[in-house]
């Protein structure tokens, strides 16, 4: 006998139907059903409801969804389901009977079924309205399920979709009303829209003014970069830019034609022109007659162009002595400010030197020194300012000479008896070191490495041969054969960059790489006024182009014989490039000898930071 025996009451049946209602509720919500144990009276044993889960699509498993805990066979039905089916049949037979007795458990079960089903439908409606989108202002539906018994159970469920459709229509109507009311609200503050428009116009005007200010600043920076680019400190002229080229040509004093045989990769560099030997045509416009070119500057510029004055120290000292002569000869009007008038005069004379040959970094630092001292003479008299500037320039020249003396002392201490010293090209400081070592009667051998087209090492050879030193003269391509015998390498410097890289005569990097390969110390001798804050990683961004005609000459040919490239300009596809400098990376440099001592190349930024006022004298 099943658990639904004689002792089962209507409470047992009501509890089981309530669980069935919960099951239907979870079924409609899409929640999986699990096996539940329903508790009855103490006299009856608990009954387990098997889980009923529909099999997935396409599956033929007949046992899918059956409870593994069910003790009944597949053909047997659950006693709870059989009891409920019997009660449903009794309800259908007694639909017309309105009498209800408390003893009749079937009628009470029917009422419980109707009430449970109404609760299920109301809960489903609440779940549907809870899934409404955010922002809907419709009120929650208040469905009052009828507690009166109906004739059949399906008659209670069809009422829900009608109520849902009515509530949805009400929601749509309310949303339409809200949408109609929304555009009417912003029409009230019309003045605010006008104020916003005026504010936007003001903002646009301010942005346009800011853009114009930026453009003006950039144009001023471009103008100032030409002057700053002269000293080699910050900006570099890009001659391949047509705008900058047009501005530079307007500012030029010497009118020289542009070179048509330039190499495309180096169009951004100033091209060499060999028209200075035929004379110089200086423009004499009316606004420029007030600031004439000094004769000493003209002669100095021509010497620069013909390379009669070469070397960073020689060029800087010659320029500073020419400035002293300008200060002595210039007389400003008494009602004019001396510093302003002299500044305009210096700019024009410096531009002439730039047109003759691009000035070196050491010359640029010297010009900055003079301009700094000139700015301190605003409150001085004309004579007092003149004397102060001449005295400052003489001190600067003495500083260069004292720096050379200090470098010579430090360099001689690194030369020992029996050393084999190698030097490349010609450096004034290295020459002084060798002469001092000879005076100290140190026994060493010197190797001079030279290269085309300048052959600067040959001039050094002629000057040192008279001192009785054993000298070996080789060309650059033979460095790898002679480097095995070398103990130290001494070279000069065109400039030392803030990242420790060296700019020197073209071919220096090859010598440094060979010295690194054979573990030979590579020592650089450089004054601190040649240091620059520029950072450069190659020799293409900044360089100078020499006379391409120098590459045509061949020393191996006999006198009177024609050169093989005598008419090279007639070949339109042939272009000659004569770069004057190259860059040696910091990894190949072992030591930099300065007037402050012997430093590693990594300490160059420290010198620029700590001794900037002493080296360059710029606030």
Swiss-Prot record:
Residues 57-84, 99-125 have a biased composition (Polar residues). Residues 42-56, 85-98, 136-199 have a biased composition (Low complexity). Residues 21-32, 200-244 have a biased composition (Basic and acidic residues). GO terms for biological process: cytoplasmic translational initiation; translational initiation. Keywords: Cytoplasm, Initiation factor, Protein biosynthesis. Gene3D superfamilies: Translation initiation factor eif-2b, domain 2. It is found in: Cytoplasm, Cytosol. GO terms for molecular function: guanyl-nucleotide exchange factor activity; translation initiation factor activity. One of its GO terms (cellular component) is eukaryotic translation initiation factor 2B complex. Residues 21-251 are annotated as: Disordered. The keyword Protein biosynthesis applies. Its main location: cytoplasm. Belongs to the eIF-2B alpha/beta/delta subunits family. Component of the translation initiation factor 2B (eIF2B) complex which is a heterodecamer of two sets of five different subunits: alpha, beta, gamma, delta and epsilon. Subunits alpha, beta and delta comprise a regulatory subcomplex and subunits epsilon and gamma comprise a catalytic subcomplex. Within the complex, the hexameric regulatory complex resides at the center, with the two heterodimeric catalytic subcomplexes bound on opposite sides. Acts as a component of the translation initiation factor 2B (eIF2B) complex, which catalyzes the exchange of GDP for GTP on eukaryotic initiation factor 2 (eIF2) gamma subunit. Its guanine nucleotide exchange factor activity is repressed when bound to eIF2 complex phosphorylated on the alpha subunit, thereby limiting the amount of methionyl-initiator methionine tRNA available to the ribosome and consequently global translation is repressed. This is Translation initiation factor eIF2B subunit delta. The lineage of its organism: Eukaryota, Amoebozoa, Evosea, Eumycetozoa, Dictyostelia.
